Regions:
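N-terminal membrane-sensor/transducer module of prokaryotic signaling receptors
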Residues: 2, 10-154
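Localized chelating/binding microdomains
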Residues: 7
Length: 154
C-alpha cells in the first residue's frame, strides 16, 4: 500500500513537470477593475499606517504598488501637488486634463472625500504608449491626500 502511494505521488510529480506551459494560466497583460480597487484599498491602509513611507513606496513602485499598467497616484488635498506618480510628480493635479480635454484633476480635487471611493472616467495613454484609451480611476481622500488608482477599459 505504501509503495503504491509512493508510485502515485512520483507519477503525479512527473506529469506536473511535463504539462505544457500553455495550459497554465498566464498573468493578464493589463490590470483589471478589481485589481485597481484592491490596490487603492491597500494604498489607503498604507497611508493610514505611515504616509511618508507609503508615498515613497508608491513613487518607487515597491510593495506591489506598481503592477503592469496599475499604479498609485496621490496629490496634496490642499494645493493639489502630485506627491506620488510615475511621471507627473510635482505637477498640480487640478491642472491635469485627459487627452480629450476632460478636467479629471479638478474633479478629483473637488469630489474626493474621506472614507468614500469615487470614480472618474477620462482618456489617457497606457504607460509606454501615445494612443489615448478610456481609463477609469478610483480615488479617495486619506491622511490629507487625494489618492487613486486607474485601469483601462478594454
Amino acid at each position: 500500500m505504501l509503495q503504491q502511494r509512493a508510485f502515485v505521488i512520483r507519477y503525479a510529480a512527473v506529469l506536473a513537470l511535463l504539462l505544457p506551459v500553455s495550459v497554465l494560466p498566464a498573468q493578464a497583460t493589463y490590470g483589471t477593475e478589481a485589481q485597481a480597487k484592491a490596490m487603492l484599498n491597500r494604498a489607503v491602509a498604507a497611508m493610514k499606517q505611515d504616509k511618508t513611507k507609503a508615498l515613497a513606496m508608491f513613487n518607487k513602485g515597491e510593495g506591489g504598488f506598481r503592477d503592469r499598467d496599475l499604479y498609485v497616484f496621490c496629490a496634496n488635498a490642499v494645493d493639489g501637488t502630485l506627491t506620488a506618480h510615475p511621471y507627473l510628480k510635482g505637477e498640480h493635479l487640478q491642472d491635469i486634463k485627459g487627452k480629450k480635454g476632460y478636467p479629471l484633476g479638478r474633479e478629483i480635487m473637488q469630489k474626493a472625500a474621506t472614507g468614500k471611493i469615487k470614480e472618474v472616467t477620462y482618456w489617457w495613454p497606457r504607460p509606454g504608449s501615445d494612443k489615448p484609451l478610456e481609463k477609469h480611476a478610483f480615488y479617495t481622500k486619506v491622511e490629507g491626500f487625494n489618492c487613486g488608482v486607474g485601469y483601462y477599459k478594454g
